[in-house]
A protein has these predicted regions:
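Bacterial N-terminal signal peptides that target proteins for export
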Residues: 2-10
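C-terminal active-site subregion of NodB/CE4 polysaccharide deacetylases
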Residues: 165-233, 239-240, 299-386
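Short, well-structured secondary-structure segments
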Residues: 176-179, 213-217, 231-232, 250, ...
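Charged helix-capping and loop-helix junction motifs
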Residues: 269-275, 304-308
Length: 386
């Protein structure tokens, strides 16, 4: 019995020793600690899209972003508007501003006001930050800068443009105005209407070499800046105004005004709409109205005259994005009704041949010197000196 007990104890001891040896020789598996789950990355709330408004053109420049509708008003990019005006933006103390003509206008994101000449003008809704730019109500901005607004209902397009009628023009300045028509050696119709390109070039050289300043009617508001202002006008909008006249204007860097008959654009021997736009965008050519169909204004009823004035005005606005301010009367004819209606649509009315023009005279009857095919450089110079 004792032997069996010893034997049993021996077995137990051997088994315990074996188990102890096995545990000592076997490495324990490391216990892995799970890494903490990172918190989810917050997803930025997307900026709500504002309803797109109508296309907007400012002084002939289309705003790339157009307009948006915010609180029932049309808003435009403050930065784009300034760029369209050719104004330089600056920022100080969080206020973004630009200077245009004699007015400094500014805005601050989130502020319920615009600033004009340092004075705050309250807005119905605050300045909106949208697409990383400041958006402001276009109507208020135009009113502060005295920029007119014209809405083209047919094409749902808004034009912001300055009319000469809003300017104060200094009085008593002598400004010779010259009337041309075609510029070509290929004469057709009435020969006297077509000046040879070589003769016109001599006339342009004379102007440049003798210190004359060819300007537009739009420049009369600052006429005192020019020593010898002169206005060159070309009636009817013939095709040669693009093929022969335009290259000469570019060569001598001279400004000119072309009076187009808008209903005849694209016709044989007349400018195309695309050519009109190209010349306007060059910065050398002002496009003004010669009515829509060249009918004698003094023979038309009042409503017919309105149609001639308004339709040609709209046609030019669509081509250039800038409101025309001058009407050239077909054949120089204008009735009392014409003169009464003119200020509703234009700031200047231009007749045919006459005497030198002085600022301050009746702007509805601007007189011009007639340059024909037979006008020599000497005769041209004499007209300048009268």
């Amino acid at each position: 019995m004792i032997n069996r007990t010893k034997h049993f104890l021996m077995i137990v001891l051997l088994l315990a020793a074996f188990l102890l040896c096995g545990c000592a020789g076997t490495a324990q598996e490391p216990v892995s600690t799970p890494e903490p789950t990172p918190p989810p990355t917050p997803v930025p709330t997307p900026e709500p899209e504002l309803p797109q408004g109508d296309p907007v053109t400012v002084e002939g420049v289309n705003l790339e972003s157009g307009s948006v509708v915010y609180n029932d008003a049309l808003y435009v990019s403050f930065q784009e508007f300034a760029e369209a005006l050719g104004a330089e933006l600056s920022e100080e103390e969080g206020i973004l501003s630009f200077l245009w003509q004699d007015a400094a206008v500014g805005c601050k994101p989130g502020n319920p006001a615009l600033y004009i000449r340092g004075e705050a003008v309250a807005l119905r809704s605050p300045v909106k930050t949208y697409r990383n730019e400041c958006y402001v109500p276009v109507q208020v901005l135009c009113e502060l800068l005295h920029i007119g607004m014209f809405y083209d209902e047919e094409y749902a397009h808004l034009y912001c443009t300055v009319a000469a009628g809003d300017w104060q023009i200094p009085e008593g300045y002598k400004v010779p105005v010259f009337m041309y028509h075609g510029v070509t050696d290929e004469v057709w119709g009435s020969a006297e209407l077509f000046v040879s390109p070589s003769v016109l070039e001599e006339q342009l050289k004379y102007l440049v070499e003798n210190g004359y300043d060819p300007i537009w009617f739009e420049d009369l508001r600052e006429v005192e800046k020019y020593d010898k202002p002169v206005i060159l006008t070309f009636d009817d909008g013939y095709l040669d105004n693009y093929t022969d006249l335009f290259p000469l204007l570019q060569k001598y860097n001279v400004k000119a005004t072309i009076f187009v008959i808008t209903g005849w654009l694209g016709g044989e021997k007349y400018l195309t709409p695309e050519q009109v736009t190209e010349m306007f965008q060059s910065g050398l050519v002002s496009i003004q109205s010669h009515t829509r169909s060249h009918r004698d204004m003094d023979t038309l009823m009042a409503d017919e005259q309105r149609e001639q004035m308004s339709r040609s005005k709209l046609d030019i606005l669509r081509l250039t994005g800038k409101e025309p301010t001058v009407l050239c009367y077909p054949r120089g004819l204008a009735s009392n009704t014409t003169l009464e209606l003119l200020p509703e649509y234009y700031s200047f009315g231009v007749k045919m041949n006459g005497s030198v023009y002085y600022t301050g005279k009746d702007p509805r009857v601007v007189t011009r010197y007639y340059v024909t095919r037979g006008t020599s450089v000497e005769s041209f110079a004499n007209m300048l000196k009268k």
